[in-house]
């Protein structure tokens, strides 16, 4: 694709760090909630695993998976001592100076080895800016924080405007060991900040984490983020408007991440955890920032030319340092049996993986994170860690084996293992490992009660208990050292009614934070289920996308809008989300699959749930059976073509085979049917995926159901919500399907391809016809979207419905012998193409009233329908049908 850059579009990526999909609601997040109503909702979104900030920042920036970017976690093994991390070989890379250290070691001074959206847009004449959280902001255009004169030099003024925690105007402080130097600003930006009444140094973040006896913060990061929002709306965007060039901007809100991490609502207890008032305040803070940006766009008219994608880098979980399940079973880890200052008795200390492995292997352990800069970076001795003396790695990282030395930039060749501790998952490197040693380490880890899933470098071959890194997009063209193993920690739910509730997820975490505070990084659905939505002139309105999407899809989608062909080195790339774009398909075909490793000698196997759209894969959950929230493992499987009757227990997973099966489901089931004509009865918190037959799915037939999704697949299917006490999702997919809501509100029905029939007998439901010639029936206060094709939309007698026909010659039946109780709305009537159906009513009874830009169609004093954007004088008798409805 050639670069076009001719449509005058601007793009903004708004990242609400750590925002969970389920945290969006009308009260806490009115702005985010309104985008879901007016723009595009991505109902099946994904963070990339490991679910940390900088990895997903690299995916958002470049559109590549982590196997290409080499940004495997917030803390990685670099293979060399980082001068700006006190000589550590395991630096925390949310730090501009450390990013500069790493960049310097790789081709093009770009450790990602991929072009980012901002970098390429900048090269094509766009104005570019990245504002907000230290670390991920710089990654959006990472070469801009490289220093002149090596690691002790200074950062030149970047072409991309970068304002993060350490930016301090035109004269940054000299580089200090262990802390980043400031990114300088162009004098024009400095002057504009001062003219707007803003300091050239960002407001500092003040959110203490506390300790094991002192609660952390009770306040959101309001002041700092208000500075960032003001800098964006009062300085950067006005400058971009004055310049008259298209722009690309990334705004990275530290909240709710920082508030959820450090909150003091739940010290040492699992509830409320990250669902307390401080976390909610952090969520609200991010929503307020987004509102300020969107309000500016609207007030200046930029909303007409600016597309906005909202995402979060990852979800979030409450930390457990002792309990490994909802029953309170305590970990048996060796590390938890020792006594440490600042750690509660029986709790896991930071560094428990390194301590346990060193103990199991009988090898010495060293701490690779010095607290001060060594006098000679060419000769570093890391401190010994002896857990029996109450010692632990300060940040959780560990060097195991050898002498713990770094000589002339090289880690001691006797080193057996390097552990990069991160939180909900850890990276393990075997600098001199072989397949036999890797297998030994896998065997040891598989016996730990806090482990749930292991992934191993493909170079070691198949190892029982582990899946290859390539299975989750971690083996590609990366230039940084590739982890030998990635280990996922156990997750569980504190919701007694739903063990797979991502909003109630708790995870074991290798972190210095306390039990009850917040963390992420795991392969549980609570961490992979981020929040993604979009709004703007190139995105559909009121569209719910049920296809899988991820952070790696953000840049390809925006590049498609901007007409940019961004060059790439690796092949692990996301996709343009074409179904969400105006003129794109109504839906794309996706598949769900399960991959399971061989078992270890103790019976553990790693299972991966993933989805695919074409060749693009999305990783939903992974781990050991029963140890990961949201993980699907088959409890029952029928491979025959016989017709089976199956009754499921709560939370079981079933694959039926290819017969004509009858499945009596329960709560929390995941059901895959085969090619036969199947009947499935299912309850709450379940997922149903039917195969190629003409299937029937009944939701809530035995008791009211909520939080259930049914996908009809191929065939002419009937999916019915019998009774609901919460939202459910119906997806017809291919075939001529019938989707019906008998009783329920806020149900979502999507016909997909084929000539479908969608019915609402409840209220406040949303029906999407998709492609094909569809029939949609509303009742009261429903929203109907016909999509492509010649559709027929019926307004129910209750009225208050909103009808959008989409492409094609559509019919809007507003009355059929009886009048609606309240006015309906037609949003996109096309004179001379579409028809208004008024069965049993004569033309002489109609009155057409102009009300602003809209036409009100009345009979007497009864308003039947408002035709938005239609002049009453443009309507003719040919725009109406007065015979009886085509449907009796």
Roles of regions detected by a PLM:
Residues 22-71, 75, 127-131:
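Short, structured active-site-proximal loop/turn typified by the sulfatase FGly-forming signature C/S-X-P-X-R
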Residues 65, 72-247, 252-266, 420, ...:
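His/Asp/Glu-rich, glycine-adjacent segments
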Residues 643-844:
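Acidic, glycine-rich calcium-binding repeat modules characteristic of RTX/beta-roll
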Residues 8-21, 34-36, 60, 121, ...:
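Beta-strand elements within well-structured catalytic alpha/beta cores of enzymes
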Residues 66-69, 145-201, 271-288, 329-372:
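Acidic, His- and aromatic-enriched active-site or binding-groove loops in soluble protein domains
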Residues 50, 76-83, 88-104, 292-307, ...:
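Secreted, luminal/periplasmic, and some membrane-associated catalytic domains
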Residues 452-486, 546, 564-599:
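Polar, surface-exposed loop/tail segments
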């Amino acid at each position: 694709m050639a670069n076009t850059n001719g449509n005058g579009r601007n793009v903004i990526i708004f990242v609400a760090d750590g925002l969970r999909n389920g945290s969006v609601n009308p009260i806490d997040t009115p702005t985010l909630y309104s985008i879901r109503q007016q723009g595009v909702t991505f109902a099946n979104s994904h963070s990339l695993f490991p679910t940390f900030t900088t990895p997903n920042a690299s995916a958002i920036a470049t559109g590549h998976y982590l196997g290409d970017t080499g940004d495997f976690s917030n803390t990685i093994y670099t293979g060399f001592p980082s001068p700006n991390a006190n000589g550590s070989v395991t630096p925390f890379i949310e730090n501009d100076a450390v990013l500069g250290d790493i960049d310097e070691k790789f081709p093009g001074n770009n450790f990602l080895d991929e072009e980012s959206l901002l970098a390429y847009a900048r090269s094509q004449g766009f104005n570019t800016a990245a504002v907000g959280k230290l670390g991920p902001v710089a990654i959006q255009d990472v070469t801009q924080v490289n220093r002149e004169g090596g690691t002790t030099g200074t950062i030149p003024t970047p072409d991309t405007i970068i304002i993060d925690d350490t930016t301090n105007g035109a004269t940054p402080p000299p580089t200090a060991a262990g802390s980043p130097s400031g990114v300088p600003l162009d004098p024009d930006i400095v002057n504009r900040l001062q003219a707007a009444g803003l300091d050239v140094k960002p407001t500092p973040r003040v959110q203490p984490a506390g300790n094991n006896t002192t609660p952390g913060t009770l306040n959101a990061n309001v002041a700092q983020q208000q500075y960032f929002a003001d800098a964006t709306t009062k300085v950067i965007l006005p400058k971009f408007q004055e310049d008259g060039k298209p722009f690309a901007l990334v705004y990275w809100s530290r909240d709710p991440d920082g508030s959820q991490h450090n909150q003091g609502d739940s010290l040492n207890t699992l509830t409320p955890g990250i669902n307390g008032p401080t976390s909610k305040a952090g969520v609200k803070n991010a929503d307020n920032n987004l509102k300020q940006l969107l309000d500016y766009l609207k007030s200046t008219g930029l909303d007409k030319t600016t597309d906005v994608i909202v995402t979060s880098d990852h979800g979030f979980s409450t930390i457990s340092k002792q309990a490994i399940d909802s029953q309170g079973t305590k970990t048996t880890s060796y590390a938890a049996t020792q006594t440490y200052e600042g750690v509660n008795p029986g709790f896991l200390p930071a560094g428990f993986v390194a301590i346990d492995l060193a103990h199991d292997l009988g090898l010495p352990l060293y701490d690779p994170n010095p607290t001060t800069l060594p006098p000679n970076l060419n000769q570093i001795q890391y401190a010994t860690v002896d857990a029996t003396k109450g010692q632990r790695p300060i940040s959780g990282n560990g060097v195991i084996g050898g002498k713990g030395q770094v000589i002339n930039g090289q880690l001691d060749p006797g080193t057996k293992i390097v552990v990069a501790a991160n939180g909900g998952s850890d990276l393990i490197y075997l600098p001199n490992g072989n397949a036999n040693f890797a297998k030994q380490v896998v065997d040891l880890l598989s016996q730990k009660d806090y482990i749930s899933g292991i992934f191993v470098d493909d170079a070691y071959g198949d190892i029982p208990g582990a899946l290859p890194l390539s299975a989750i997009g971690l083996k590609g063209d990366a230039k940084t050292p590739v982890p030998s193993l990635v280990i996922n920690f156990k997750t569980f739910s504190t919701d007694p009614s739903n063990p797979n509730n991502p909003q109630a997820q708790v995870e074991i975490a290798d972190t210095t934070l306390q039990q009850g505070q917040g963390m992420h990084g795991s392969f549980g659905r609570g961490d992979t289920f981020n929040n993604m939505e979009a709004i703007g002139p190139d995105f559909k309105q009121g569209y719910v996308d049920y296809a899988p999407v991820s952070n790696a899809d953000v840049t390809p989608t925006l590049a498609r809008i901007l007409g940019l062909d961004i060059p790439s080195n690796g092949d692990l790339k996301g996709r343009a989300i074409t179904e969400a774009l105006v003129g794109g398909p109504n839906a794309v075909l996706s598949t769900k699959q399960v991959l399971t490793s061989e078992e270890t000698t103790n019976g553990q196997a790693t299972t991966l749930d993933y989805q695919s759209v074409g060749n693009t894969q999305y990783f939903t959950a992974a781990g050991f059976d029963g140890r990961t929230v949201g993980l699907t493992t088959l409890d029952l499987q029928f491979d025959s073509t016989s017709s089976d009757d199956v009754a499921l227990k709560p939370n079981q997973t079933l694959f039926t085979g290819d017969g004509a099966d009858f499945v009596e489901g329960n709560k929390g089931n995941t059901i895959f049917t085969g090619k036969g004509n199947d009947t499935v009865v299912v309850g709450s918190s379940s997922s149903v995926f039917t195969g190629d037959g003409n299937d029937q799915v009944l939701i809530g037939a035995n008791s009211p159901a909520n939080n259930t999704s049914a996908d009809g697949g191929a065939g002419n299917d009937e999916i019915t919500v019998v009774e609901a006490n919460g939202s459910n999702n119906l997806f017809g997919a291919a075939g001529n399907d019938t989707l019906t809501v008998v009783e329920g509100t806020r149900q979502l029905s999507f016909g997909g391809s084929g000539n479908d029939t969608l019915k609402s007998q409840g209220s406040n439901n949303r029906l999407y016809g998709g492609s094909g010639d569809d029939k949609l029936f509303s009742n009261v206060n429903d929203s109907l979207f016909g999509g492509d094709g010649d559709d027929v939309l019926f307004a129910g007698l209750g009225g208050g419905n909103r009808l959008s026909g989409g492409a094609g010659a559509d019919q809007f039946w507003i009355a059929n012998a009886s009048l609606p109780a309240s006015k309906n709305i037609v949003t996109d009537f096309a004179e001379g193409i579409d028809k208004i159906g008024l069965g049993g009513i004569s033309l002489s009874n109609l009155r057409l009233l102009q009300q602003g830009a809209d036409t009100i169609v009345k009979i007497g004093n009864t308003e039947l329908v408002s035709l938005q954007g239609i002049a009453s004088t443009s309507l003719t008798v040919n725009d109406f049908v007065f015979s009886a409805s085509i449907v009796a």
